[in-house]
Amino acid sequence: HHIDRRMEQMRAEGVEFRVNQHVGVNVDAKKLLAEFDAVVLSGGSEYPRDIPAPGRELKGIHFAMDFLPWQNKKNAGDTVANQLFATGKNVVVIGGGDTGSDCVGTSIRQGAKSVTNFELMSQPPVEENKPLTWPNWPMKLRISSSHEEGAKREFSVVTKGFTGKD
């Protein structure tokens, strides 16, 4: 419901949404540039990247898109069977990007016993080194509102396998 409200607000402000377009196939790139002052290509993904590691098949290991939608449905007042909740659990989130951050925050808000976030990359510096990174995206430590809620973060972690008893 929140996303629907935001989209309606943006439509009312003049934003035009065209989804499932293949630029260069069913939409001409030159026509886009000629007709619009700004074009946003936002290629999000609902398809996860799996970790081909021993033990991956254990119960309790889930993709973000199997976990996050349940909370959105609950927030919208929907009741859905077989919901995944982090309440009372020790949660590890593998991945330090925006989706990982969403999983961290959702787990904390659901009352997880603990939340640890593993990031493959080494911890970047707090301050960016502009001469080193410009014109690329600056390498500096970013702390999302989800991380501010209390997750432990570990950097330079390579997932080699999973162990457990289902």
Where are these regions (language model features)?
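A Rossmann-like FAD-binding core segment of flavoenzymes
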Residues: 2-49, 62, 72-81, 108-166
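A short, gly/pro- and small-residue-rich
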Residues: 52-69
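Short secondary-structure boundary/capping segments
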Residues: 53, 82-84
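Beta1/beta-strand and adjacent pyrophosphate-binding region of the FAD-binding site
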Residues: 85-97
